[in-house]
Structures are given as structure tokens and as C-alpha cells.
């Protein structure tokens, strides 16, 4: 991930950097003025936007759609909510009810699951388990009573492979009382992955051959070939020695707030400010190791829950 170097009057304050988490922990970052993509500007000439807007209040409208998506010049198909990937940041308030009207404009069923939120079962958003799903052309209203929690979470589709196509976004539930984590700036960083291949194509290839996307397989001409004993061991396990992940960076482009590594992120901040960054892993199957070279920070929350602050140089966030 590339970053734009801040001007000289901006600098990291190592001892005051905060973190908080969603499906994980939180770490880096800081925007004095949000760049165009973070504000939802259309940089892709009519294609789905990168970055997300924010929705809040007692009545929230969300629309599920689809269209072309371009990441670092690679074009693919995307399912987006309110026209962007990730979809909008849903900002809620502990103790307050909310009505979320979700309209499905796809040609297939869809859904939204509110990951980590404690809700009546009929609003959990898992088709075939807690509700029938949202049919094409229909609107489903999640009429959620007063929320009983605060913290960082995320929402995503529970229909087919729509999540990998871009159907996901962040949730922040503000506490009813004073927030135990005080910060001058508070931002969301949603990590995910992108491929121009359709998710069903990836699934089809993996079902036909689990090593289809493994482009680093051992050969007899390797400088350090496996011994016969090692080869027999891997054969007994029915595994390849280089099978770290079913799909790796050879196929995926890894994203931060919908932007690829070459597209850049810029976070500006003022000296001495306390910054909280809420990190969410919205990827299909990727684990991220997060660090800021030369900077220590504090993990102050995990899975939406406040935790005793832990100073770290790096953390791993799963999906």
C-alpha cells in the first residue's frame, strides 16, 4: 500500500497513536481533509466508486446494485451498495432504534447481515435461516429496536458470493455515554481484496482443482528440490508444499478503503493529536498483518469490544 508523504508540519506522535477495531483491532492513520475518493467522488468515469460515504439517523436507505469496477486499470464486475465499494459507513447510536430500508436492484436475491450486532433473529440477515432474503426489485426494512452495544463492526451480504464482489461496508455504533477511548480524529480503514475474475469463476476453478491458483509449485529443476521423503510426506497429506492459500496475491489485488496499493492513500494529521483508526477485514479469505514502520500503537478494542490497551508494533487481523 502506497502512501502520500505528509508535509513537514504533520508527523506521527508515536506515544499517542490509538487503535480500535471491528472484526479485529485498529491501527494507523489520519486524514485532515479526506481525499476525493474517500468522499465518494467518481474517479472511474461512471463505474462504481471506490471509497464510501456515510449514512446515519433513525431512517437509512441503502440500495444494492451492480456494475463495472476498475482497480489499478483492471476491470471487473462488482456488486455495490449506494454506488460504491465498500458500501456506506453506517453510523448508529447505542440505545437508539433504527430503520434500514434495503432495496435490491439485482437480478438475483440479496441480503445484508449486520456482523456482530445483537439483533432480533428476523433482522440478522441470513437467507434461509433468519429471513427469506431480499428478492429482486423488493425492499426489506430492518426495523431494529434500541441497540444494546457500541463499537466497530461491519455489514456484508450473506447471499451467494456477493460479499467478494464488493457487497460489504463498515458499521460504527457510538456509545450512549462517554467513549472510554478519547481521540482527536476517528477514521475507518476497511481492508479487502479484488480480482477481475468473477467469484463464481474462482469457486469453479477451485472445485475442479484445488491447486489451480498455486503458481509456485515445486519442480524437479528447483535449486532446492524436495527430498523423496518430503515428497512422500506431502503426498500422504494430499497437499502441495507451496499451498499457503487457495488464492494469493497472484490473483488478488489487496485494497484499503476500496483502493489498490498503487492508487495511494493519504492521511494527514496535526502534531500531538490522538488518532483512532478502526480496522476492519472485509476480505474474502485474506489475513492481513498491519504495522507502521517505526511507530508503536495501542490496540484498544477487538470484535467491537473495548479491551485493556496493548502496545504493539504489528497485529494480524483475520477474516
Show where each model-derived region lies.
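Extracellular/periplasmic metallocenter environments
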Residues: 18, 107-108, 119, 128-184, ...
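Mobile cap/lid helix-loop segments that border enzyme active or cofactor-binding sites
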Residues: 66, 75-77, 191-270
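C-terminal segment of N-terminal export signals and the immediately downstream linker at the start
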Residues: 10, 32-68
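N-terminal secretory signal peptides
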Residues: 1-16, 23
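Histidine- and aromatic-rich segments of cupredoxin/plastocyanin-like copper-binding domains
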Residues: 122-135, 233-319
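Asparagine-centered strand-capping/turn motif at beta-strand->loop junctions
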Residues: 102-106, 280-282
Amino acid at each position: 500500500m502506497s502512501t502520500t508523504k505528509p508535509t513537514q508540519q504533520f508527523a506521527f506522535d508515536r506515544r499517542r497513536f490509538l487503535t480500535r477495531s471491528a472484526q479485529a483491532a485498529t491501527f494507523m492513520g489520519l486524514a485532515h481533509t479526506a481525499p476525493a475518493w474517500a468522499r465518494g467522488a467518481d474517479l472511474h468515469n461512471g463505474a462504481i466508486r471506490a471509497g464510501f460515504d456515510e449514512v446515519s439517523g433513525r431512517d437509512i436507505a441503502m440500495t444494492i446494485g451492480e456494475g463495472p469496477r476498475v482497480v489499478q486499470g483492471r476491470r471487473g464486475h462488482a456488486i455495490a451498495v449506494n454506488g460504491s465499494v465498500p458500501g456506506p459507513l453506517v453510523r448508529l447510536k447505542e440505545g437508539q432504534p433504527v430503520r434500514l430500508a434495503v432495496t435490491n436492484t439485482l437480478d438475483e436475491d440479496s441480503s445484508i447481515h449486520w456482523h456482530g450486532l445483537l439483533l432480533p433473529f428476523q433482522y440478522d440477515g441470513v437467507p434461509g435461516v433468519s429471513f427469506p432474503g431480499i428478492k429482486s426489485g423488493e425492499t426489506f426494512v430492518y426495523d431494529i429496536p434500541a441497540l444494546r452495544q457500541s463499537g466497530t463492526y461491519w455489514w456484508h451480504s450473506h447471499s451467494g458470493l456477493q460479499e467478494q464482489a464488493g457487497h460489504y461496508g463498515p458499521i460504527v455504533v457510538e456509545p450512549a455515554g462517554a467513549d472510554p477511548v478519547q481521540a482527536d480524529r476517528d477514521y475507518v480503514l476497511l481492508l479487502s481484496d479484488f480480482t477481475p475474475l468473477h467469484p463464481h469463476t474462482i469457486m469453479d476453478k477451485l472445485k475442479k482443482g484445488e491447486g489451480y491458483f498455486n503458481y509456485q509449485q515445486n519442480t524437479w529443476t528447483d535449486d532446492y528440490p524436495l527430498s523423496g521423503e518430503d515428497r512422500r510426506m506431502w503426498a500422504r497429506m494430499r497437499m502441495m508444499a507451496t499451498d499457503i492459500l487457495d488464492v494469493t496475491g497472484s490473483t488478488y489485488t489487496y485494497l484499503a478503503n476500496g483502493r489498490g496499493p498503487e492508487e495511494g492513500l493519504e492521511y494527514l494529521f496535526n502534531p500531538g493529536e490522538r488518532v483512532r483508526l478502526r480496522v476492519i477485514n472485509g476480505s474474502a479469505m485474506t489475513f492481513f498483518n498491519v504495522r507502521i514502520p517505526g511507530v508503536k500503537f495501542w490496540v484498544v478494542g477487538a470484535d467491537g469490544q473495548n479491551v485493556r490497551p496493548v502496545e504493539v508494533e504489528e497485529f494480524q487481523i483475520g477474516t
